[in-house]
C-alpha cells in the first residue's frame, strides 16, 4: 500500500496530512500542524520561509516514526508570493508577504503605463495589488538583477527538497503574467518590467512527477525516501480538485482566510463583462479554468479574534453572533481598508459610522456583521457569475475551514436561493492527495477522485429558504454609495 503526504500551507497555518486509499475510500491522518505568519523585518512584512522548511522536516520525521520508509509527497501553499534565487541556487532574501504595503497604488501606477484592458485580454486575471505582477513592479532592482530564477513559494519548497526548479501552472496563473492564448509567460508584460522571461522556470502542469528528495536531506533528517509530485500547488486549485461536486451547474466556494467563489470551466472567459466585474481565470488542474472572484474571507473574523486577545473561540463567536438580528450592519468585505488595518475592530466600527449605520459594539455584533456581509457578497457574486457565463447555478459546494461555520453556510443558502453542500474542511489537502494518486495510477481521473471524496467524507447540506434578498441588496447598494 502506498502512503501519500500532503504538505498544505496556508497564510495562517500549515499541516502535513498522511493519506491512503483503502477500499475506494480516502483515509486521512494529520501528522503535524504548525502556525504560519509574517513578521516585520528589514522594512517589510516577511514570511519565515526557513522555519516553514524546518516544520516540513519535523512533519516528515513524524511520518518516518510511523514506520513509513517511502512515500509520495505533494506541496500546495497560498499564491502570488515568491523567492528570488541567486546564481548559486541560494535564497537572496526572505519572501515578502502579499499583505505588505509596498504595492499600494501599484495597480494604478502600472496600468497608467500599460492599459488595464490589454493586461486583462492577455491574462484573464483580476486586478489586485497583491498579484505577483505588481510585487515585481515595485521589487528592488538590485535584487531582481541578481536573481537567476523567480520561484513561487510551493515551487521554492519543491526546489529545496529535490533541486528541481519548475513553475507549476495553477499557481503561475495567479501572477497575472501568463498569456491565456500562448499558454506561456507573457514576454511583453515582463519586458515592461525589465524582467527576462528566462528568470522563470519551465511551466509544468499539475500531476507531473518532480523528483526524489535529495540525499543530503535523507542524511541530515530521519525522513522517508519521498517521490515528490507537482500537484495543483495553488491551494485554491487543490481545494477545487478536492470538491465533492457531481453533475453540472455547480459553483465552489473555498472558504478560509480568503473566500474564493467561482465555477470550474473548460475555457476561460475574458470578455468585457468579466473584465468589468474584475473576474479572474486562474488555471486549474487537468486543463480546467477556475473562473472566480477573490473575496476577503475569514481573515476579518480572525483579526477580530486577535483584537479580542483570543478570549473567545471561533465557535463561541458564532454562537454570540446568533443572538443578534442579521444584516443590522453591512460592510463591503472586499474594501481594501480591511486588507491589513492596524485594528480590524476599529476599522469595522469606523466603516459603519461613515456609512450611516449603527455601530457594532460586542464581539457577537461584530461577528454577526461580518458573517452576514460575507453571505451577502457570496450571493451577489453568484448572481453576477450566472449573468456572465450564461450558466444556471443550482448548487454551491463550500470547502475549507469555513465549511464548518454552519451559520455562514445557512445564510449563504438563504440569500443565494440554492442548495449548499459543506465540506470537507480539508479539501485542499485532499485535492493535493488526489492529484498524487492520479499520478501514481491509483485513481483514474479527477471525476473519479471526486466520487471517492463523496464516499469518504460527511458532507453537510443546507437548504435555501425565505429571506429578504432584494431588500438587503438595496441596503448594501446604499452603503456602497457612501464610499
Swiss-Prot record:
GO cellular component: cytosol
UniProt-annotated binding residues for ATP: 11-15, 257, 302, 401
Binding residues for substrate: 79, 234-236, 294
A Pfam family per the record: FGGY_N
Active site: 235
GO molecular function term, any single one: ATP binding
Presence of the UniProt keyword Cell inner membrane in the record: no
GO biological process, one term: rhamnose catabolic process
Catalytic activity: L-rhamnulose + ATP = L-rhamnulose 1-phosphate + ADP + H(+)
Pathway: Carbohydrate degradation; L-rhamnose degradation; glycerone phosphate from L-rhamnose: step 2/3
PANTHER family: L-RHAMNULOKINASE (PTHR10196:SF93), SUGAR KINASE (PTHR10196)
HAMAP family recorded: Rhamnulokinase
Protein name: Rhamnulokinase
Organism: Listeria monocytogenes serotype 4b (strain CLIP80459)
Protein's gene: rhaB
Amino acid at each position: 500500500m502506498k502512503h501519500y503526504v500532503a504538505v498544505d500551507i496556508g497564510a495562517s497555518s500549515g499541516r502535513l496530512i498522511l493519506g491512503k486509499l483503502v477500499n475506494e475510500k480516502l483515509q486521512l491522518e494529520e501528522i503535524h500542524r504548525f502556525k504560519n505568519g509574517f513578521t516585520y523585518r528589514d522594512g517589510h512584512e516577511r514570511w519565515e520561509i526557513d522555519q516553514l522548511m524546518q516544520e516540513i522536516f519535523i512533519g516528515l520525521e513524524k511520518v518516518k516514526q510511523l514506520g513509513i520508509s517511502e512515500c509520495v509527497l505533494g506541496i500546495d501553499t497560498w499564491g502570488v508570493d515568491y523567492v528570488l534565487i541567486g546564481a548559486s541556487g541560494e535564497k537572496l532574501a526572505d519572501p515578502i508577504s502579499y499583505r505588505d504595503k509596498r504595492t499600494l497604488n501599484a495597480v494604478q501606477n502600472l496600468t497608467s503605463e500599460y492599459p488595464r484592458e490589454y493586461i486583462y485580454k492577455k491574462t484573464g486575471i483580476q486586478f489586485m495589488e497583491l498579484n505577483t505582477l505588481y510585487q515585481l513592479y515595485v521589487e528592488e532592482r538590485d535584487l531582481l538583477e541578481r536573481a537567476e530564477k523567480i520561484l513561487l513559494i510551493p515551487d521554492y519548497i519543491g526546489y529545496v527538497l529535490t533541486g528541481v526548479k519548475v513553475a507549476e501552472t495553477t499557481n503561475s496563473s495567479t501572477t497575472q503574467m501568463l498569456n491565456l492564448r500562448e499558454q506561456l509567460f507573457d514576454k511583453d508584460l515582463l519586458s515592461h518590467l525589465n524582467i527576462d522571461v528566462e528568470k522563470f522556470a519551465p511551466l509544468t502542469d499539475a500531476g507531473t512527477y518532480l523528483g526524489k528528495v535529495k540525499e543530503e536531506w535523507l542524511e541530515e533528517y530521519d525522513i522517508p525516501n519521498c517521490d515528490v509530485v507537482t500537484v495543483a500547488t495553488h491551494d485554491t486549485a487543490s481545494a477545487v480538485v478536492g470538491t465533492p461536486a457531481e453533475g453540472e451547474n455547480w459553483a465552489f466556494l473555498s472558504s478560509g482566510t480568503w473566500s474564493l467563489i467561482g465555477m470550474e470551466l473548460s475555457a476561460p472567459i475574458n470578455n468585457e463583462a468579466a473584465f468589468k466585474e474584475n473576474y479572474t481565470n486562474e488555471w486549474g488542474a487537468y486543463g480546467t479554468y477556475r473562473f472566480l472572484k477573490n473575496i476577503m474571507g475569514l481573515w476579518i473574523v480572525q483579526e477580530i479574534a486577535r483584537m479580542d486577545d483570543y478570549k473567545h473561540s471561533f465557535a463561541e463567536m458564532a454562537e454570540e453572533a446568533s443572538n443578534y438580528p442579521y444584516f443590522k450592519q453591512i460592510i463591503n468585505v472586499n474594501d481594501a481598508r480591511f486588507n491589513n488595518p492596524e485594528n480590524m475592530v476599529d476599522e469595522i466600527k469606523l466603516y459603519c459610522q461613515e456609512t450611516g449605520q449603527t455601530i457594532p459594539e460586542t464581539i457577537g455584533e461584530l461577528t454577526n456583521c461580518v458573517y452576514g456581509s460575507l453571505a451577502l457578497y457570496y450571493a451577489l457574486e453568484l448572481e453576477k457569475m450566472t449573468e456572465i457565463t450564461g450558466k444556471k447555478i443550482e448548487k454551491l459546494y463550500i470547502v475549507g475551514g469555513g465549511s464548518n461555520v454552519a451559520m455562514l453556510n445557512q445564510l449563504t443558502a438563504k440569500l443565494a436561493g440554492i442548495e449548499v453542500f459543506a465540506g470537507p474542511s480539508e479539501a485542499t489537502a485532499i485535492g493535493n492527495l488526489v492529484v498524487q494518486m492520479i499520478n501514481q495510477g491509483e485513481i483514474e481521473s479527477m471525476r473519479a477522485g471526486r466520487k471517492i471524496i463523496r464516499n469518504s467524507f460527511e458532507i453537510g447540506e443546507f437548504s435555501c429558504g425565505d429571506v429578504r434578498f432584494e431588500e438587503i441588496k438595496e441596503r448594501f447598494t446604499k452603503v456602497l454609495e457612501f464610499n
